[in-house]
């Protein structure tokens, strides 16, 4: 399943964020709302999430062509992106026990969710 949503990592929340919202917190809350609005779903196990991070507008066309589909090896961390997505979808994400996350460069932000079939069938 492909969702045209720009991935946002889960920020470190502070007590002050309850009454004074910082920009990263507001971005994350908007991301959660968009995920719920578009009906994003993820299985409890055997999933592969690909986070497509949009390339900066300042990059040249040559650099964009070189980097499209290549691994994104900068911040945000893939675990914070995955944590943000799981918290947006599930009230209690403790039921999720197996999954994989990848982040790559792309023209626009996307979240691609695939099932990994038969991986744990023999266990």
Model-derived features with residue positions:
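Acidic, proline/glycine-enriched N-terminal capping motif
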Residues: 1-123
């Amino acid at each position: 399943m492909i969702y045209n949503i720009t991935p946002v990592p889960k920020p470190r929340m502070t007590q002050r964020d309850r009454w004074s919202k910082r920009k990263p917190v507001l971005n994350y809350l908007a991301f959660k709302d968009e995920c719920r609005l578009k009906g994003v779903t993820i299985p409890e196990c055997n999933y592969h999430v690909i986070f497509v991070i949009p390339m900066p507008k300042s990059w040249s066309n040559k650099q964009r062509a070189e980097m499209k589909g290549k691994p994104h090896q900068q911040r945000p961390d893939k675990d914070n992106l995955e944590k943000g997505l799981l918290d947006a979808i599930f009230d209690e994400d403790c039921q999720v026990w197996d999954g994989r996350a990848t982040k790559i460069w792309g023209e626009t932000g996307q979240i691609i969710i695939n099932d990994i079939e038969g991986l744990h069938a023999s266990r």
